[in-house]
Design a protein with these regions (language model features):
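Short, charged/polar micro-motifs that form catalytic or ligand-binding hotspots
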Residues: 50-51, 65, 139-143, 194-197, ...
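Hydrophobic, Leu/Ile/Phe/Ala-enriched alpha-helical segments that form helix-helix packing faces
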Residues: 50, 97-101, 105, 208-215
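Active-site-proximal, Lys/Arg-enriched surface segment
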Residues: 27, 81-173
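Gly/serine-rich nucleotide phosphate-binding loop at the start of the catalytic core
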Residues: 1-87
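Single, function-defining residue in the core of a domain
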Residues: 1-36, 44, 108-111, 126-127, ...
Length: 320
């Protein structure tokens, strides 16, 4: 990192990327600006360069390159400001980048939104705001940890993946720390803190709505078994986008020949298929909330004697 001005903070190759993607413009559009001191664009580029330096800001200030750099308080104020709309910045940058990528790919290629969650561990932390005790269901560990659930929304065309939105989810029942009372309740930072105390199914429809409103083109939402629940499927379907997701055997009911059955009995009523050895059966049915779906049963690769179920609200799709 050099101290010769804003334009010299990045290597030429990275500076070209910043210019092409208009990153500083997206920062301004998200309200990430300052009226005095080091500019937000300058601070953002400094923090970005830390990735390639392999140091945190504390170590950078101890190095020989620290002359003329902002103090750590300036960096922390920049990162922690509740008035900066980082969600708008990420969505604006990603939507703009997706439009550039889409212009270079086949327009007939299906484009999807992908919902997933993972564990964001902070086991050594004690005073982190909204820190909670969470259960890790998304890995093989199946254990409790201190931290958050990281709910993410991404876009893909099968060859490119682009992050669109994310939410760090805490818990009202097992929270360790609460919301900082000094946060202005009118800011976007406070709204994200309130969102963190909600559930993933309540946050997902809003995330999808923001993505579609920003101009992101997608035909399907892909989800795993933790999110393929009938109320959430209905909320997404009402936004004009179809859902494809893995379904687990629960008490959810499906209508076949005027009979309501669970997933296991639905498998028995499904029509066997012979055109692919790993595709066992398929059936057209209706969920309890009135949405018609197609359920395809495939062979479990980890246990050939068992099956997995994939649900789609687009009944015109083939089994493949």
């Amino acid at each position: 990192i050099t101290n010769n001005g804003l334009n010299n903070q990045l290597p030429n190759s990275l500076q070209a990327v910043f210019d092409e993607l208009k990153i500083l413009k997206h920062l301004r559009n998200a309200g990430i600006t300052k009226s005095a001191g080091f500019s937000c664009g300058y601070l953002f580029q400094l923090i970005f360069c830390l990735i390639f330096e392999g140091k945190n800001w504390f170590r950078m200030l101890e190095s020989k390159k620290s002359v003329g750099l902002p103090c750590k308080d300036a960096i922390y104020r920049f990162l922690n400001s509740p008035t900066y709309n980082w969600r708008r910045f990420l969505l604006s940058l990603s939507a703009s980048t997706i439009s550039k990528v889409s212009a270079l790919t086949n327009h007939q290629r299906p484009k999807v939104l992908i919902i997933d969650d993972s564990a964001y561990e902070r086991n050594r932390s004690k005073k982190v705001e909204l820190l909670a005790r969470c259960f890790d269901h998304s890995s093989q560990k199946m254990r409790f940890y201190k931290g958050f659930r990281l709910l993410t929304l991404g876009w893909s065309d099968g060859a490119t993946f682009m992050p669109l939105d994310f939410s760090l989810l805490s818990s009202t029942k097992s929270s360790i720390n609460g919301i900082d009372e000094r946060i202005d309740k009118r800011t976007c930072g406070y709204k994200r803190r309130k969102e963190a105390l909600g559930t993933a199914p309540s946050a997902i429809p809003d995330m999808i709505q923001r993505a579609l409103a920003s101009g992101v083109d997608a035909s399907y939402v892909l989800m795993d078994t933790w999110f393929t629940q009938q109320p959430l499927i209905k909320a997404i379907k009402e936004q004009g986008i179809d859902v494809i997701g893995m379904v687990k055997a629960t008490n959810q009911r499906y209508s076949v020949d005027n009979k309501w059955v669970d997933l296991k009995n639905l498998y028995k009523l499904a029509t066997p298929t012979n055109h692919h050895k790993d595709i066992l059966r398929s059936v057209h049915t209706t969920m309890a909330n009135g949405i018609p779906v197609k359920v395809v049963f495939i062979r479990n690769r980890n246990n050939h004697s068992r099956w997995l179920a994939i649900l789609s609200t687009d009944c015109s799709l083939t089994e493949q």
